[in-house]
Curated annotation (Swiss-Prot):
Entries under SUPFAM superfamilies matching the protein: Class II aaRS and biotin synthetases, Nucleic acid-binding proteins
Positions contributing to Mg(2+) 1 binding: 414, 421
EC number(s) from the headed UniProt entry: 6.1.1.6
UniProt-listed InterPro entries: Aa-tRNA-synt_II, aa-tRNA-synth_II, aa-tRNA-synth_II/BPL/LPL, Lys-tRNA-ligase_II, Lys-tRNA-ligase_II_N, Lys-tRNA-synth_II_C, NA-bd_OB-fold, NA-bd_OB_tRNA
The species this protein was found in: Christiangramia forsetii (strain DSM 17595 / CGMCC 1.15422 / KT0803)
The organism's taxonomic lineage, starting at the top: Bacteria, Pseudomonadati, Bacteroidota, Flavobacteriia, Flavobacteriales
Protein name per UniProt: Lysine--tRNA ligase
Length: 569
C-alpha cells in the first residue's frame, strides 16, 4: 500500500498519535528504546506485600488518567493486573525544567502507551495502594487507540470490545482490554501443566512425532495436502499421531505421550477448528478397563488443578469430574434412546433404520458410519455428566482390538460430557494380520466414496510385525476439555488465534460517500430526499456518492409506495 493512501485511511486519533510521535522524536526522546528496563515488581506483588515508602520499579500500559494541573492520577496495567500511580510535576521534575511532566506526560503520552516507572509506595486518603512516581520513561508509543470501554457517571459500561469476530481477529487488543480473557488462557496453561505432571509422576515419556506425514493415519478425517518440492511427493498435515506413538511402543517404551497440533480439512463450527490440540498417551501391558480408571483419575486431577474443584459449569449444566464415571455400552445406549438394537444388523438394515429415524445418510456410508450417525443424532446429546460409552462395533474402530467376549465389537470407549466427546480410548490392535484386513476394509470404503476412510500404512504394519505388547491408548481433545473447564461455548474463545474467514478489505470512501453514510447511521430507514437535503450535496455529487455506496454494497435504496427510502445494508 502506498504511504499516501495509507495516511488517508488513518482516523483522526491515529493521525494525532503520529503527530505526537514526531514531536517526541524532535524532543530527542526515543519512543522505542532498546535498553533493558529494570523491572523489579509486579502490580500484584506490590499489593500482596505492600510496604509504605518502599521503592519499586514497574512497567506496563497506561490505561487511564486524570490530569489536574501539576498532578495526575493514572492507572498502569502489567501482565498481572492494574495499580494506581500518582504523577506530581515537582516530584518528577525537581529542577527548573518542568518539560518532562508538562510536555511529555501531559501532552505527548496517550492511553495504551507502555511506560516504565520508578517510584515509592504510599496509600491515598481513601486507602488505595498507589505508586508515587519519582521518574518515568516512555518504552513504546502506541499509534492506535485501544478499544477501551467507557464508563458513565452511573457506573454503566458502554462501547466495550465485545464483538466476537473483532475480538478473535484482534486477540492482542482483546487481551489488553478484557482481563477475563487472559484468565481463560492462564487456565489453559494450568491444564497442560497438570496433565504433564500427572504423566511425568508415573514416568511416562513425552515425545514429538512428525507433523508432515507421507500417509495421514490414526483417524478418520480429511487431511490437508501439500507438496514437498525437493522430494517431489505429496505430504499431509497430521490428522493424528497415533501410529507414530505405537511405533515407539514397538521400540520398547512402556509409556509415551504427546501434546500434538492436528489438522483436519473439514468444516468449522463452535466446537471444531481446522487446527486443534490433542493429547495422546499409550501405555504398554494395559487394557481399556485400566484406561477408564486412569482417565477418571486424570480428569479429576486436572479439574482440581485448573479450578480448585471437580465441579464445573457449562452453560445451563452443572457437571462433576469426580471419579468414578457412569459406563454404558454403545449398543445399550442406542437401544435406550431409539429402541433399535444394532446387534447383527446388515448395512442395508442399518441404512433403513437410520432413514426411518429421519437421519441424513447416503450410499457411501458403511456399517460403522451408519451406526456413528445413529448414535450421534439420537444419543450423544443425552450424556451430560461424564459418561463412558463402551464396546463400539468393529466397523467403527479399525485400529482397535476385537472385544474379548464378542467378535462383533471392539474394546473401545469414548468419554462424553455435555453431549460431546472429549476422550477416545482403545485396547490397541496389535495383531498385524488383523490390522491389515481392517485397513483393506477401509480401502474399500474409500473406493466407495468415503473421503474420511483411513489410508493403508505399510510401514506401520511392518512395525507391528516386529511385535507390539498389549497396549492401551487414550486421546483427549484439549481445546474441548478447556471449554468445559472455563464454561466457554465456542472453541474460538479458548484458542489465542482461531481460524477466521478472510477479513474483508477496508473500503475507501470519498468524502461525499462518507458524509451520506454518516447521516444514515442515526436510524434504520430514511427517506432518500431527507438525507439528500441534509447532505447539502449537488445533484451530481449526490448521485455519484449514492452510486458508490451501492456499488460497495453498503446501502440499500428501495421504494415504499410513492416514497424512495434508503438504509444501511
Amino acid at each position: 500500500m502506498h504511504k499516501k493512501n495509507y495516511m488517508q485511511q488513518l482516523s483522526e486519533q491515529e493521525q494525532i498519535r503520529r503527530d505526537k510521535l514526531t514531536a517526541i522524536r524532535k524532543a530527542g526522546i526515543n519512543p522505542y528504546p532498546a535498553d533493558l528496563f529494570p523491572v523489579d515488581h509486579t502490580t500484584t506483588g506490590i499489593k500482596e506485600n505492600f510496604e509504605e515508602g518502599k521503592n519499586v520499579v514497574i512497567a506496563g500500559r497506561l490505561m487511564s488518567r486524570r490530569i489536574q494541573g501539576k498532578a495526575s492520577f493514572a492507572e498502569l496495567q502489567d501482565s498481572k493486573g492494574r495499580i494506581q500511580v500518582y504523577f506530581n510535576r515537582d516530584e518528577i521534575c525537581t529542577g527548573e525544567d518542568k518539560s518532562k511532566y508538562n510536555d511529555l506526560y501531559k501532552k505527548l503520552l496517550d492511553i495504551g502507551d507502555f511506560i516504565g516507572i520508578e517510584g515509592e509506595l504510599f496509600k491515598t486518603q481513601v486507602g488505595e495502594m498507589t505508586v508515587m512516581v519519582k521518574d518515568f520513561h516512555l518504552l513504546s508509543k502506541a499509534l492506535r487507540p485501544l478499544p477501551l470501554p467507557k464508563t458513565d457517571k452511573e457506573g454503566n459500561t458502554h462501547d466495550g470490545f465485545n464483538d466476537p469476530e473483532q475480538r478473535y481477529r484482534q486477540r492482542y487488543a482483546d487481551l489488553a482490554v478484557n482481563p477475563k480473557v487472559k484468565e481463560i488462557f492462564v487456565k489453559r496453561t494450568k491444564l497442560f501443566n497438570a496433565m504433564r505432571n500427572f504423566f511425568n509422576e508415573r514416568e511416562y515419556f513425552e515425545v514429538e512425532t512428525p507433523i508432515l506425514q507421507s500417509i495421514p493415519g490414526g483417524a478418520a478425517a480429511r487431511p490437508f495436502v501439500t507438496h514437498h518440492n525437493a522430494l517431489d511427493i505429496p505430504l499431509y498435515l497430521r490428522i493424528a499421531n497415533e501410529l507414530y506413538l505405537k511405533r515407539l511402543i514397538v521400540g520398547g517404551f512402556d509409556g509415551v505421550y504427546e501434546f500434538s497440533k492436528n489438522f483436519r480439512n473439514e468444516g468449522m463450527d463452535r466446537t471444531h477448528n481446522p487446527e486443534f490440540t490433542a493429547m495422546e498417551i499409550y501405555v504398554a501391558y494395559k487394557d481399556y478397563n485400566w484406561m477408564m480408571e486412569f482417565t477418571e483419575q486424570l480428569l479429576e486431577h486436572c479439574a482440581e488443578a485448573v479450578n480448585g474443584t471437580t465441579d464445573a459449569t457449562f452453560g445451563e449444566h452443572k457437571i462433576n469430574f469426580k471419579a468414578p464415571y457412569k459406563r454404558l455400552s454403545m449398543t445399550d445406549a442406542i437401544i435406550e434412546y431409539t429402541g433399535f438394537d444394532i446387534t447383527g444388523k446388515s448395512e442395508k438394515e442399518l441404512y433403513e433404520a437410520a432413514k426411518g429415524m429421519d437421519i441424513e445418510v447416503d450410499d457411501t456410508m458403511g456399517k460403522g458410519k451408519l451406526i456413528d450417525e445413529i448414535f450421534g443424532e439420537k444419543c450423544e446429546g443425552k450424556f451430560i455428566q461424564p459418561t463412558f460409552i463402551t464396546d463400539y462395533p468393529k466397523e467403527m474402530s479399525p485400529l482397535c482390538k476385537e472385544h474379548r467376549d464378542n467378535p462383533e465389537l471392539t474394546e473401545r470407549f469414548e468419554l462424553m460430557v455435555c453431549g460431546k466427546e472429549i476422550a477416545n480410548a482403545y485396547s490397541e490392535l496389535n495383531d498385524p494380520l488383523d490390522q491389515r484386513e481392517r485397513f483393506e476394509e477401509q480401502l474399500k470404503l474409500s473406493e466407495k466414496g468415503d473421503d474420511e476412510a483411513m489410508f493403508i500404512d505399510n510401514d506401520f504394519l511392518r512395525s507391528l510385525e516386529y511385535g507390539m505388547p498389549p497396549t492401551s491408548g487414550l486421546g483427549i481433545g484439549m481445546d474441548r476439555l478447556i471449554m468445559f473447564l472455563t464454561n466457554k461455548q465456542s472453541i474460538q474463545e479458548v484458542l489465542f488465534f482461531p481460524q477466521m474467514k478472510p477479513e474483508k478489505k477496508a473500503v475507501e470512501l470519498s468524502e461525499e460517500e462518507k458524509e451520506v453514510f454518516k447521516l444514515l447511521k442515526n436510524d434504520s430507514v430514511h427517506e432518500l430526499n431527507d438525507i439528500k437535503e441534509q447532505s447539502g450535496l449537488s445533484n451530481k455529487k449526490w448521485d455519484k456518492a449514492v452510486k458508490g455506496l451501492r456499488k460497495h454494497k453498503m446501502i440499500d435504496v428501495f421504494k415504499e409506495g410513492e416514497t424512495l427510502n434508503m438504509k444501511i445494508s
